[in-house]
């Protein structure tokens, strides 16, 4: 008589086992993610308060952030007025040189264009100067230039606080911000009263 060996059972995943696996994986991933509180309270000295916010719509980020800074200095101007003068339809945007030239039209202000780093950014913010920066939001070789207004930074959450497009007080992690800013050439613009 020949004995036939029963085939071994292949392990099956029980519903409870799959559920437990998913819980462990998801819990592990959420522990690695940085969470930012829904409402941030900026009580540190590195947030420039009361800077007007103009949402940048349809490639109008340059005129929007420029209007924010100029209004913060007491000039009554809206992004549409700036856009009529410096927005270039062919490039769907505004050039850095035109941003600088427009700001220099105003009396009793100093316009400083520079190539910065995180230290210079922090120094300017701690002196109360919001900074216009040019970043590249594109991926790989696809370029997508964008102006942001940096209004603060917070080391406790590890990021800068910006006005970007339609978002006010958007927090961007240092690593991501520096990557975008590097692709934009680390260009920054400070506009201040003399």
Where are these regions (language model features)?
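Positively charged N-terminal leader segments that act as targeting/secretion signals
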Residues: 6-20
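N-terminal compositionally biased, intrinsically disordered segments and leader/signal-like regions
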Residues: 11, 28-31, 35
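Bacterial N-terminal signal peptides
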Residues: 19-30
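Conserved active-site-adjacent core of cysteine acyl-enzyme catalytic domains
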Residues: 32-52, 70-72, 76-194
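Beta-rich catalytic cores
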Residues: 57
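Active-site-proximal loop/helix segment associated with metal-binding centers of metalloenzymes
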Residues: 61
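An acidic helix/loop motif centered on a single conserved Asp/Glu
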Residues: 65
